[in-house]
Each structure stands twice: as structure tokens, then as C-alpha cells.
Amino acid sequence: MLKVAVMFGGKSVEHEVSIITGLQVIENMNKEKYEPIPVYVGRDGRWYTGKGLLDISNYKDIPSLLKKCEQVVLPPVPGLNKLYYYPFRKKFMSKEYDYIDVDVIFPAFHGTHGEDGTMQGLFQLANIPYVGSGVVGSATGMDKVIMKDIFKANNLPIVNYLWFLRKEYEKNKEAMLDLIESKLKYPMFVKPANLGSSIGISKAKNRDELFDAIEIAIYYDRKIIVEEAVKDPMEVNCSVMGIDRDLEISLCEMPVPWEEFLSYQDKYMRKEKGGKGSTTRQIPAPIPEEKTKEIQELAKKVFQILDCSGLARIDFLLEKETMKVYVNEINTIPGSFAFYLWKPLGISFEKLIDRLIEYAVERHKEYARNMYTFETTLLLKAADRGTKM
């Protein structure tokens, strides 16, 4: 039986959504094949484990919950595959420090310090198999500026955009507004570069609204991206699963919007019959078959270009009048792991989790084939000559 550390929470404005996703993963995991270990990461970055983390009702009072849990840490030491209790303590009648064995890590983070490559780097250093994209795919999938630059370099259809730094804007706000207006047409969307769930995003139809939108966005990030809005858009999403070039494509969905664009409240706070508070969606998306195929092929290409792994959801915009498709963004750890896009294909949430863990183990074996040493006499020569080369 594999011991799977399911990690959630984190230093992110999407903290609460991550808790829900993490508990959904644990709830739907096959307990005959896996032993789930809940690992909650607090807003301060500290890691906790304990049975109390399994009950969603306990999160109404997190300080009280954490008093019943124990802190753990993951040393970045290859081969340990252990979470150590912290402060470090020795096992009873032993000189060895107490720990929890871990075979696979299943990150269920959303947003910064979890979905952006930071945690993935730690898992990589510790040499533990982990679910989802690696450092590169996670980092590029989180930063909207780098993501859009890569899309543009690969001739993918995207809207016009520009980006700037918070300190550049604060140095001369009017000049930055002038620059944006000279490059882009209203209406526009202003977004923090490194957030998801529509947090910090605003639509601007004129200069005053543009100013207000930027003032909101700079509260969340040092880097801001501004995009031209698609006229009368329809949002369509598609999920991709697999590793390398062995990929599967899900059905497409069309979220039914409550407002002009899906806000955080729309996505997570409005209750849907039979759900845990989510967006109303149409599956499959009611669009022509050729557009469905076009979106599925683009989704696959995005997944490969960013070197993603495991599972991701790619979001698109369709201009209603022309039916032109635009790639919007990728979510390398989508909410609920987009299980609802795979269920109509006969892949239950439980089977989806199985696949993702299998991919994690397979990719880890592939990484193990890489050579990280190279025999050379360089240091011997340096010792003879001193530090000068």
C-alpha cells in the first residue's frame, strides 16, 4: 500500500479552495490501494498533519484545529522519503528521529507557494515522486506574463496584451496609463500575473476604471498584465492528462457565467445542486464539433509546450460572432482536478487519482535514468594550480 501525502492550504489567497480540493482527493482515494496522509500548510508556511485535518467542519476554527495537529517538515535530502515531526523528537527507546514514511506526494495547492514550482522544487530535491507538473511547467503555468510570451512565441492564438512592474507604475501612474491606452483598446482586463480563481482581476471600460483596476491588482503582485477583452466572449475549458506525448483529452465544458466574467464568488461561493459550491457548467460545451476539435488540439499543444505532466485544465475564449478561438490560460492544478470533465468519459474521480499517482511514479522512474555526474580531472588540475583557472 502506497503512503500518499496529500498537501493543501498554503501561502496563497486561494488557501480555502485548496483545502476543499485536498479533502476531495482524500475522500475519493482508493483506501485499499493508498494510505492518505493529510498535510495542511498554514498561511504562515508551516506544515501540519493529524486526523482532525480530514473533517472539513474543523476548518471553521483553524487555530483550535492546529492545536490538535503536529508539525512536520520535509528535509530536501534524496532518499529519505520521510516527513519528520517538528520540533524533532526521537522515537521511543531509539536514537532515530520520529518520522512518517511517504511514497508519493499529491499536491492539491492552488496559487502561489504551491502551484508555482516552489513546492515542486522541494519535492525534486527530496527525490520523492509527486503528482502533477514539474518545476518548469508549474512556474510557467502560474506566471501569466511568461505563459503568454511562450504562447506568442509558438504562434498560439492569444489576445493583445502588455505587462509592467508595480514599481514602474508607481513611479509615474499617468504615463503608464497613457502607454496602456496607446497599445490596447477598451475594454481591458487587468490581472495580477501570478494569481488564479479570478482574484484581483477587474474589467476596465475607461481610464478611470483602468486606474482603479491597476490599484487593485498591485495589491496582489509586483507584476501586472493587461489584456484586451474579447468581444461577446464564451468561455470554454478542456483538460489534458498524461506525460510527455502520451496524452488524453477530456470533453470541453462551458461555464455558465453569472456576470461579465467569472469572479471568485461565481466560481466557488454559489452553490450548485449536488456540488460543494461551484460554477454551473454545460458538458459537453454547446459549440460546433470543429471548434471542439480545434480547442482540444490547442489544449494538447499548450500542455506539451509548457512541459506539463499529470493533469491540467486549459481555458479558452471564443468570440461569439466570429467563433475565433483564443487561448486564455492553463491551470496546472485545477479545482477538484477537473474530475467533472473526465467523468462523462467513464473515468471516475477515484480512477483519475489512480492515473495521476501512476504518472507520478512513472515520471520519477524516467528522471532516475538521468546522469548527474561527469568524471573530469578539473578539480585535480585546480588543486595543482590553486584557485586560478
Swiss-Prot record:
Keywords: ATP-binding, Cell shape, Cell wall biogenesis/degradation, Cytoplasm, Ligase, Magnesium, Manganese, Metal-binding, Nucleotide-binding, Peptidoglycan synthesis. Cell wall formation. It is an enzyme of class 6 (ligase). The keyword Cytoplasm applies. This is D-alanine--D-alanine ligase. It is found in: Cytoplasm. It catalyses: 2 D-alanine + ATP = D-alanyl-D-alanine + ADP + phosphate + H(+). Residues 148-358 form the ATP-grasp domain. Gene3D superfamilies: 3.40.50.20, ATP-grasp fold, A domain (3.30.1490.20), ATP-grasp fold, B domain (3.30.470.20). ATP binds at residues 181-236. The gene is ddl. Signal peptide: none annotated. Transmembrane segments: none annotated.
